A protein has these predicted regions:
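A sensor for short, sequence-defined functional sites
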Residues: 1-144
Length: 144
């Protein structure tokens, strides 16, 4: 087997959704990664072996600059989980006017037994946690 590496770079001016005075930014992710496996809903237990398509390390690093008048409203996130199936690391923090986001999941087994399924599910549940997928901002009224 050979590894495939993708490097994605983009610049976006306004992929934002405004809701009730708040701005929601959905962090982009590749359609070729775990998202392509369509495993957004996982049962709590499993009676048969699960085969995932391939071993994967999926990593995203984002740096977002905030303009004056925009306030970052999301809480900082620090998620670290490791088990015999792999690991998940998600960190979101603000440093001055920059938001730093790091997301990484690594799966080291592609055949998951029913006994291991709970560990697999725990990793995917953290990876799909909405806290690590959306950033919330509020535009301040500077005319007050």
């Amino acid at each position: 087997e050979s590894a495939v590496n993708y490097r994605l770079s983009f610049k976006a001016n306004s992929p934002l959704v405004s809701q009730d005075g708040y701005i929601v930014y959905n962090l982009p992710e590749t359609e070729q990664g775990i998202k392509s496996w369509e495993m957004s809903r996982l049962n709590t237990d499993r009676k048969s072996t699960l085969e995932i398509p391939y071993l994967i390390t999926e990593t995203y690093d984002y740096l977002l600059s905030i303009e004056p008048g925009i306030e970052f409203k999301s809480n900082p996130v620090e998620i670290k989980k490791q088990n015999k199936i792999g690991s998940v690391n998600i960190r979101i923090r603000q440093i001055n006017n920059t938001i730093q986001v790091h997301k990484e999941i690594q799966l080291s087994k592609n055949t998951i037994t029913p006994a291991e399924y709970g560990d697999f599910r725990a990793l995917l549940t953290e990876w799909q946690n909405p806290l690590g997928q959306k950033l919330i901002f509020k535009k301040n009224d500077i005319n007050k």
